[in-house]
């Protein structure tokens, strides 16, 4: 387990934390946390709180609404998991916490973190359960009947079990929207608003995400009350430890360029992002034909196949994962050292989520962007948006990677 003292630091000046009640607390022991929760935190492998944890946990425990922003790989999931667990009363086997995630994989990962950090708080190992699409609704109904204190799920399935009357909302204390920018995008906004219709009016709402565009902050005014804001300056929104490069290449030469990279560079594990399911399958097929151990994943695959692919990649049995933006948000694979954007993302926010797959928890990582002539303007937009510089890949790149 990667420990928090290995998480990529965010500079104190990176935070716009001029609101009252937002001050860094450098030790978990100095936070208002139950002893059994502290046991779980240290048992999980955390030693010192990351920057976002230093700022977000204490305001979370006070019960007010929160908008918190932190880069991928900086302990964001730990921050809201700890804050959420502190707010719950484990003497009552009632559903009190709800976490909404944009993907099944992220929901499953989040539930595991909450379960492990909270293992000394509950007599039941099943106090936290997942509710996601691609599984039998009947199984979810049985989970709820047996008793759940924390529910983690995707909006569609959570909305379904609420409407069935199986997930009772009157005892809910806390709602967390993870990857809030995605959750409030056009695809999820209607489902989120539908869920809010069933929630207690005094429920605590916490939004956590790596990016928080102004339009999302405007949307939050509809359902949040005087939230504490813990935001990062835009110029700080490129991960420390991630070196970014581009290769100028025409579309028809991208595959050959990719093959050349894998022939000349020693890569521990890498993620390749493409923008369509068809291209993902094609890249994976070509790499496998060239004797590379490659896995591929996209949203149209069955849930069981996606879980199998992720387990294979996490274990190191597969060293290359080709995927769409499905895994760009929050999927934890600690040994990825190179991210390749075979296609530049269509949306600037997803660039940050993608390159966050490399160099997680303070490790050195590299992002390589394949840029066609028509992509040049988008590349400049990404540089301007994050106040960063993306250099052309040096000729001696293999030597650089071996440093």
From Swiss-Prot:
Subunit comment: eIF4F is a multi-subunit complex, the composition of which varies with external and internal environmental conditions. It is composed of at least EIF4A, EIF4E and EIF4G.
GO biological process, one term: cytoplasmic translational initiation
Keyword RNA-binding: yes
EC number assigned by the record: 3.6.4.13
Listed name of the protein: Probable eukaryotic initiation factor 4A
Residues that coordinate or bind ATP: 70-77
Catalytic activity: ATP + H2O = ADP + phosphate + H(+)
Intervals of motif DEAD box: 178-181
């Amino acid at each position: 387990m990667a420990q928090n003292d290995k998480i990529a630091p965010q500079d104190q000046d990176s935070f716009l934390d001029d609101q009252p009640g937002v001050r860094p607390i450098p030790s978990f022991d100095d936070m208002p946390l139950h002893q059994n929760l502290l046991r779980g935190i240290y048992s999980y492998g955390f030693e010192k709180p990351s920057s976002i944890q230093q700022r977000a946990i204490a305001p979370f425990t006070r019960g007010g609404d929160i908008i918190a922003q932190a880069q991928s790989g900086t302990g964001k999931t730990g921050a809201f998991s700890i804050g959420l667990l502190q707010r719950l009363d484990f003497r009552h086997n009632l559903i009190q916490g709800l976490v909404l995630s944009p993907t099944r994989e992220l929901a499953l990962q989040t539930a595991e973190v909450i379960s492990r950090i909270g293992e000394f708080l509950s007599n039941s190992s099943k106090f936290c359960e997942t509710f996601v699409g691609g599984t039998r609704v009947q199984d979810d109904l049985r989970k709820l009947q047996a008793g759940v204190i924390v529910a983690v799920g995707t909006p569609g399935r959570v909305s379904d079990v609420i409407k069935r009357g199986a997930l009772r909302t009157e005892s809910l204390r806390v709602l967390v929207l993870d990857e809030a920018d995605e959750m409030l995008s056009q695809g999820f906004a209607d489902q989120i608003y539908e869920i809010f219709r069933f929630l207690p009016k005094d429920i605590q709402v916490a939004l956590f995400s790596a990016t928080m565009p102004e339009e999302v902050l405007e949307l939050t005014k509809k359902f949040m009350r005087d939230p504490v804001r813990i935001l990062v300056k835009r110029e700080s929104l490129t991960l420390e430890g991630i070196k970014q490069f581009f290769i100028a290449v025409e579309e028809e030469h991208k595959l050959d360029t990719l093959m050349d990279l894998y022939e000349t560079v020693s890569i521990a594990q890498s993620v390749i992002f493409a923008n369509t399911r068809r291209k993902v399958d094609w890249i994976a097929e070509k790499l496998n034909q060239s004797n590379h151990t490659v896995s591929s994943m996209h949203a149209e695959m069955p849930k069981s196949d996606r879980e199998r692919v992720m387990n294979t990649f996490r274990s190191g049995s597969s060293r290359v994962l080709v995927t769409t933006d499905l895994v760009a948000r929050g999927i934890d694979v600690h040994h990825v050292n190179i991210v390749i954007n075979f296609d530049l993302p269509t949306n600037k926010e997803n660039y940050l989520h993608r390159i966050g797959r490399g160099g997680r928890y303070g490790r050195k990582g590299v992002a390589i962007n394949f840029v066609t002539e028509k992509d040049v303007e988008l590349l400049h937009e990404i540089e301007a948006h994050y106040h960063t510089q993306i250099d052309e890949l040096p000729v001696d790149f293999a030597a650089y990677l071996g440093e």
